[in-house]
Amino acid sequence: MVIGAGAGIGGNVAKRFAKEGFHSVLCRRSNQHGLDDLIRGIEEEGGTASGFLINVIEPESIEECVEKVENDIGPIETLVFNLGAQVGNKSLSETTYKIFELGWRLATFSLFRTASSVLPKMEKRGKGSFLVTTSTSAFRGNAGQHSHASAMGGRRMLCQSLNAEFASKGIHIVHILVDGMVDAPDTLGKMMGQENFEKLRKTRGMEHDGLVLPDKVADTYYHLSKQHRSAWTYEIDLRSFSDNAWWNHPTLNI
């Protein structure tokens, strides 16, 4: 089950797991047409998938979706929490209480609700993988990122707490830092504008491998879900070979 299944990392993770014989459940906030396209692409390659439009801000939306999947489709073996929480680059004076709270609800509270819904079920079964995506802001704040950085930092700390409680119960919690620009039209493309995004792809993406490729990221997610419990990864960071790591980078271009 993927929460945050867009055309980038989330959709490619769903596709990767379906390729291995899993039934993928894709959840996203909007764009039924885009969701249908992702499901169709999985089915055309011989996989199976279902999709739901859910707004994680709404009360009970996550909880009801998890129950529906468990009851109508089957037990959730791997949960991928890939929900974005970017509310825009805003100065402190531009960051209203409402905007600050929105970042928290998207990045941290929705993860808490997902964990509260899924992990007790995994605990009863004595197994499961719970994979969580974050960005550079989970490690380092930057001007204009008051809401996003504090919320993503909270997401990382919540992952640590979940790991401390559930790893010994057979549940693999992984915090995955994607430290770089992802070649995804519905995230980076929207942030930059389509024209600028295509220019960037021609200069840094494609054969240059300077953008993080979602299908290659998906390979890592699948590998993490299959790790032997004697050598589990808790935290991992992914970036292009040509990018400086976040601790050596002068700015955060996310």
Regions of interest found by a model, annotated:
Residues 22-37:
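Conserved glycine-rich Rossmann-like NAD(P)H-binding loop of the short-chain dehydrogenase/reductase
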Residues 140, 161-171:
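Active-site-adjacent segment of SDR/Rossmann-fold oxidoreductases
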Residues 168-171, 175-179, 183, 193-254:
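C-terminal helical subdomain
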